[in-house]
């Protein structure tokens, strides 16, 4: 009975929407035109164009055929007329488009003649003509309007997929599940079926206009209608992201001041992995913003004015970094994600003297986010250094010290590190303390990807022990200053923002040296063996 009702609803939707549409107007004469290059679609296109009411159809001159193009334009006009409430729309049918899939920018659509002939362009047409920008919403409504069918066993197919892909975010219907960059044909087909089913449910509950929103609030009800149960908080977070299209990237979304442009990487190989990492990163960013606003109220006025940043996911760079001058965050590894976002928020006017504070502040805000797996190699060495073939005597000694100090800090043995909520915090402190307590040992732990003397000496305060300085040592010193009341986090955040804030916290080199000497004395007293 439930299936019959759902089928009846789908039929009534298509019939009702079609009844409201208008017949396609007759073609007029084609005229010469041009699409000027712009930031969104950077291509100069000379065209043969025809206007049909609110619809403009533009063939690039290389794609125009005097016989075939009028027939294709008539097909587009018929599809457009099936869309009730369609606004003014321009469709560019071109050879060699900038993207393999149809691309939408506002009310403009760019695609190939083959995409029109096959119907592949229809979700993009729905998006451009009706202002429905969500990827799954456009896909689902397009299938509803143009005769797509949801299989009777959709719930079983979803259940089977989720059973085979533990932790999958398929039900978020994030754009990753609709693109060949991240998903195979079977996954895309299942996501499309889900999109149509959910779109029909939303229309039945609130009408077609509701599809212009995220529709996250309808997810629990839709799942219930299918007889499925799932934890929806994370799924709804992904649905609520401000997803957009970009000609150079398979997916794009904005959160706070950051525009993220995910691409396949070694840690985001498919839709499930990409959506999981994006969810983790966005959840961390939300926490970070709240922490900065709450704990650095004096600096927050500056922080919330941070200019927009682009976040790129890249594997062809040496290390993750934040380019403050060009406002670009480069992510080379998953563990660096929130750390680099913290840099973007807490560095306004870079100065070399404050370099170590940059790192300390960023790690203070984000080290809880680092997982056991992110620092797996260090946990493994701490626990098993005695059995590592080729390890030097100094390395065995240092990691033995790290193991001892880690237990003092955390209360658990190295073998139990995974039971801790934030295992990276005691690990990084233990590594730092062990290195500072035993500078005579010939060991260097790489907590940065390029720990060269040139980089260190040019970036960090010269009088600080720059040849030994790392992110971890900066972090541990900042933690000491905070825990012993020498500075508030607000003061440290201000010190990271610009030179004026740094000088307010550390007015002279002598004062800095005094603080650091006191830190080393405390370290020897508390953790010296």
Where are these regions (language model features)?
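Beta/coil-rich, acidic/histidine-enriched accessory regions frequently appended to metallopeptidases
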Residues: 22-34, 49-52, 58, 63-64, ...
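Juxtacatalytic substrate-recognition/specificity segment
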Residues: 44-135, 151, 254-354
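Positively charged n-region of N-terminal signal peptides that target proteins for export
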Residues: 1-4
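Stable alpha-helical elements in mature extracytoplasmic
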Residues: 72-79, 117-122, 137-141, 191-198, ...
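Active-site-proximal alpha-helical
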Residues: 163-224, 393-508
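Sec-exported extracytoplasmic/periplasmic mature domains
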Residues: 81-85, 126-134, 146-151, 163, ...
């Amino acid at each position: 009975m439930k299936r019959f009702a759902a089928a009846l609803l789908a039929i009534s939707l298509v019939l009702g929407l079609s009844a409201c549409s208008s017949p396609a107007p007759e073609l007029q004469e084609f005229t010469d035109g041009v699409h000027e290059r712009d930031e969104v679609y950077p291509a100069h296109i000379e065209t043969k164009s025809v206007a049909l009411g609110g619809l403009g159809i533009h063939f690039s001159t290389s794609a125009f055929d005097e016989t075939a193009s009028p027939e294709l334009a008539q097909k587009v006009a018929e599809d457009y007329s099936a869309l009730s409430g369609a606004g003014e729309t321009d469709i560019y049918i071109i050879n060699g488009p900038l993207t393999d899939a149809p691309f939408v920018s506002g009310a403009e659509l760019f695609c190939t003649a083959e995409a029109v002939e096959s119907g592949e362009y229809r979700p993009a047409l729905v998006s451009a003509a009706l202002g429905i920008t969500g990827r799954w919403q456009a896909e689902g409504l397009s299938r509803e309007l143009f005769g797509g069918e949801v299989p009777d066993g959709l719930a079983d197919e979803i259940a089977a997929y989720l059973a085979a892909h533990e932790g999958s975010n398929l039900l978020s219907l994030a754009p990753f599940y609709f693109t060949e960059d991240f998903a195979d044909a079977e996954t895309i087909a299942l996501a499309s079926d889900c999109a149509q089913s959910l779109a029909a449910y939303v229309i039945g509950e609130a009408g077609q206009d509701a599809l212009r929103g995220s529709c996250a609030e309808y997810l629990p009800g839709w799942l219930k209608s299918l007889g499925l149960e799932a934890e929806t908080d994370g799924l709804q977070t992904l649905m609520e992201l401000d997803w957009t299209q970009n000609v150079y990237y398979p997916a794009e979304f904005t959160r706070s001041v950051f525009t993220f442009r995910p691409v396949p990487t070694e840690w985001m190989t498919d839709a499930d992995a990409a959506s999981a990492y994006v969810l983790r990163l966005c959840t961390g960013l939300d926490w970070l913003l709240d922490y900065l606003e709450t704990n650095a109220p004096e600096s927050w006025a500056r922080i919330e004015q941070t200019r927009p940043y682009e976040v790129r996911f890249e594997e062809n760079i040496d290390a993750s970094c934040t380019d403050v001058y060009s406002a670009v965050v480069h992510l080379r590894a998953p563990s660096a994600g929130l750390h680099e976002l913290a840099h973007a928020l807490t560095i306004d006017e870079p100065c070399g003297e404050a370099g170590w504070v940059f790192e300390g502040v960023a790690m203070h805000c984000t080290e809880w986010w680092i997982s056991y797996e992110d620092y797996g190699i260090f946990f493994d060495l701490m626990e098993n250094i005695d059995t590592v073939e080729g390890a030097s005597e100094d390395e065995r000694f240092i990691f033995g010290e790290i193991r001892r100090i880690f237990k003092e800090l955390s209360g658990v043995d190295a073998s139990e590190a995974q039971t801790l909520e934030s295992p990276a915090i005691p690990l990084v402190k233990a590594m730092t303390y062990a290195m500072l307590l035993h500078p005579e040992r010939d060991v260097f732990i790489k907590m940065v990807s390029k720990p060269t003397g040139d980089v260190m000496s040019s970036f960090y305060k010269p009088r600080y022990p720059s040849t030994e300085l790392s992110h971890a040592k900066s972090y541990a010193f900042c933690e000491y200053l905070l825990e012993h009341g020498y500075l508030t986090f607000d003061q440290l955040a201000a010190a990271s923002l610009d030179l004026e804030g740094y000088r307010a916290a550390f007015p002279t080199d002598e004062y800095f040296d005094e603080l650091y000497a006191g830190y080393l004395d405390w370290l020897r007293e508390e953790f010296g063996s």
